[in-house]
């Protein structure tokens, strides 16, 4: 099977080339705004008709080369389609930050031997150096580069390249370890594996820092000035970057601390936002804005690269079912003191650990080729095995 990841490559430029790249990126962004205005007026998302009506104007007004003009039109159309899919209404996107979309072997190329990045600009092709550290593995014969984005941040240039490569699938006969992962707020992740080991990833620091960012935004919202709104946007972006780094560290630790042939079993939290009415008003923002999906995505692609697999199962009753005797009752769990105590057999443990144990048990019952069909099996339907203490 194929996997695509986005690799980040730093471009090293001298002052003269820096100005050329800045001018090209600015012209490209201005052209995107021009096309965005045309589409907003016409509501036309046909690439053929948009290209027919704007291609020559883009080249004449902004000086873009042929492939750049076509890439500009594709970028704007894709942006509109994303907005319509998510917002269900016409909102005009504005391209404020300078950017440049580059097609592999047409607009840009990379020379791994000499560490040279060749790119088309308004002034023709230029060649600059790039930092190859951490990128060497992508220069193998099996890797294919896609349309990259050149961006500038804090005076530095970075190339974001989608890289597609082949990976071997993990057959169910090679699964030797099952890890149940319970995600939450008090603990970002709690795991339970086939050797009976439990690991807790504490979330208190993350919770406190997010509360700090929320208080800052609330204070700035009361000011209501343009500068305060810019500050709010910057704080939100900083928080997102920091949270993504936390998810990266956790997913990396999970993958590297488990051997090849590991099956990670997670709860399917697709409808977590729909459950807000069961959460106290003051806790709703924290609950619905938690980055469960980001951690899931990072773990999924990292696991595939290490000959591991991640699947999702129905989370119903995972926190109410005793992993020792199978008794399911809401009263088994005491949320206030974060403790699970079975009303039938008396088995007691941390409630998040119980969730991880039940997910581990459900993972052992899954057949990987039938994982999609078995995703909605519940904890109460799985045969109970006595866990290691």
Language-model region placement:
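Nucleic-acid substrate recognition interfaces
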Residues: 1-389
């Amino acid at each position: 099977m194929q996997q695509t990841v986005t690799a980040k490559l730093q471009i090293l430029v001298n002052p003269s080339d820096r100005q050329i790249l800045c001018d090209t990126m600015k012209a490209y962004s201005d052209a995107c705004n021009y096309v965005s205005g045309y589409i907003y007026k016409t509501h036309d998302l046909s690439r053929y008709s948009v290209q027919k009506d704007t291609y020559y104007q883009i080249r004449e007004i902004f000086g873009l080369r042929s492939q750049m003009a076509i890439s500009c039109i594709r970028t704007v159309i894709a942006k509109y389609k994303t907005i319509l899919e998510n917002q269900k209404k016409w909102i005009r996107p504005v391209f404020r930050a300078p950017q440049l979309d580059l097609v592999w072997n047409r607009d840009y190329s990379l020379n791994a031997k000499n560490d040279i990045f060749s790119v088309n600009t308004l002034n023709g092709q230029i060649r600059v150096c790039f930092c190859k550290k951490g990128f060497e593995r992508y220069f193998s014969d099996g890797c294919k580069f896609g349309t990259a984005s050149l961006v500038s941040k804090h005076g530095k240039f970075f190339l974001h390249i989608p890289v597609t490569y082949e990976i071997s699938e993990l057959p169910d006969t090679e699964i030797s370890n099952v890890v149940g992962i319970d995600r939450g707020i008090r603990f970002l992740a709690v795991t339970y594996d086939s050797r009976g080991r439990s690991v807790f990833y504490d979330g208190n620091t993350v919770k406190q820092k997010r509360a700090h960012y929320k208080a800052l935004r609330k204070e700035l919202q009361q000011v209501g000035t343009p500068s305060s709104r810019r500050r709010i946007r910057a704080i939100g972006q900083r928080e997102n970057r920091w949270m993504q780094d936390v998810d990266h560290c956790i997913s990396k630790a999970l993958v590297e601390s488990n051997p090849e042939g590991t099956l990670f079993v997670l709860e399917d939290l697709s409808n977590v936002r729909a459950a807000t009415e069961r959460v106290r008003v003051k806790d709703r923002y924290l609950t619905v804005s938690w980055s469960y999906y980001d951690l899931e995505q990072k773990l999924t692609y990292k696991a595939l690269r290490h000959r591991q697999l991640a699947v999702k199962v129905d989370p119903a009753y995972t926190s109410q079912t005793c992993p020792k005797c199978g008794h399911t009752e809401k009263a088994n769990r005491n949320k206030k003191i974060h403790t699970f105590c079975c009303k039938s057999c008396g088995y007691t443990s941390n409630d998040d650990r119980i969730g991880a144990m039940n997910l581990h048990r459900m993972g052992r019952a899954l057949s990987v080729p039938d994982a999609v069909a078995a995703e909605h099996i519940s904890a109460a339907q799985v045969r109970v095995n006595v866990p290691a203490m």
